[in-house]
From Swiss-Prot:
Location within or outside the cell: Membrane
Glycosylation sites: N129, N142
Positions on the Cytoplasmic side per record topology: 1-9, 71-93, 183-202
A GO CC term attached to the entry: plasma membrane
Protein name: Transmembrane 4 L6 family member 1
Record GO biological process: blastocyst formation
Domain of life the protein comes from: Eukaryota
Pfam families per record: L6_membrane
Keyword DNA-binding in annotation: no
Protein biosynthesis listed as a keyword: no
Keywords: Glycoprotein, Membrane, Transmembrane, Transmembrane helix
Organism: Mus musculus (Mouse)
Length: 202
C-alpha cells in the first residue's frame, strides 16, 4: 500500500474519531437530556474546556482533511523534478499530524483529569460539589460510592461513560497521528510511490 493511501485511511479514521469526540463532549452538557444543569453551572469544570469539541474534534479535522486531500494532488511536478511534489506533500503532512497530536493530547489530558475528579453533583444535603475529588479516582472502581450523588440522576454513569469515550477516541487519534508522522517522513524522505511497484503495508 502506498504511503499516500495509508495517509488517506488515517484521515478518514480521524474524521470518524473527531465526530465521536464532538458528540460525546456535547452530550456532557445535557445530563438526562436537560439543559438546566449547564445554565446553572452545575457541570464539571472540565466539560467547559471543550476538549472533545476543540482538541479531539475541530482541531483534528485539519490534519484529517490534509491526509485525505493528498490523494487528489498531482503526483509529479515541483521545482522541475518528478515526484518532488508528492514528497513535499508527505513531509508537510507531518506538520499537520503534529497539530493533531497536540489536539488529541489535550483531549486525553482533560478527559483523564475529568475522570479522576469525578462529576459535580448534589449530595444528600443539597450541596453541589465534587464529591469524589478526594478519592483520587478510586470511585471508578467502587460503584457503591456513586449513590452519594443525588442530582442529576445517574450523573456518575453519564460522566464516566462520556469522558471514557473521549479518552479512548483521543488516544486513538494520538496513535494515528503518530503513525502519520512516521508515514510522512518515510514517504517524504524515502520517496513517494507513484507506481504500483513501490508499495508497503501500512
Amino acid at each position: 500500500m502506498c504511503y499516500v493511501k495509508c495517509a488517506r485511511y488515517i484521515g478518514y479514521s480521524l474524521v470518524w474519531a473527531a465526530v465521536f469526540c464532538i458528540v460525546a463532549n456535547a452530550l456532557l452538557y445535557f445530563p438526562n437530556g436537560e439543559t438546566k444543569y449547564a445554565t446553572e453551572d452545575h457541570l464539571s469544570r472540565f466539560v467547559w474546556y471543550f476538549a472533545g469539541i476543540v482538541g479531539g474534534g475541530l482541531l483534528m479535522l485539519l490534519p484529517a482533511f490534509v491526509f485525505i486531500g493528498m490523494d487528489e494532488e498531482d503526483c509529479c511536478g515541483c521545482c522541475g523534478y518528478e515526484n518532488y511534489g508528492k514528497r513535499c506533500s508527505m513531509l508537510s503532512s507531518v506538520l499537520a499530524a503534529l497539530i493533531g497530536i497536540v489536539g488529541s493530547a489535550y483531549c486525553v489530558i482533560v478527559a483523564s483529569l475529568g475522570l479522576a475528579e469525578g462529576p459535580k453533583c448534589s449530595d444528600a444535603h443539597g450541596v453541589w460539589n465534587y464529591t469524589f475529588a478526594s478519592t483520587e479516582g478510586q470511585y471508578l472502581l467502587n460503584s457503591s460510592m456513586w449513590s452519594k450523588c443525588y442530582e442529576p440522576k445517574h450523573i456518575v454513569e453519564w460522566h464516566v461513560t462520556l469522558f471514557s469515550i473521549l479518552l479512548a477516541f483521543a488516544a486513538v487519534e494520538f496513535i494515528l497521528c503518530l503513525i502519520q508522522v512516521i508515514n510522512g517522513m518515510l514517504g517524504g524522505l524515502c520517496g513517494y510511490c507513484c507506481s504500483r511497484q513501490q508499495q508497503y503495508n501500512c
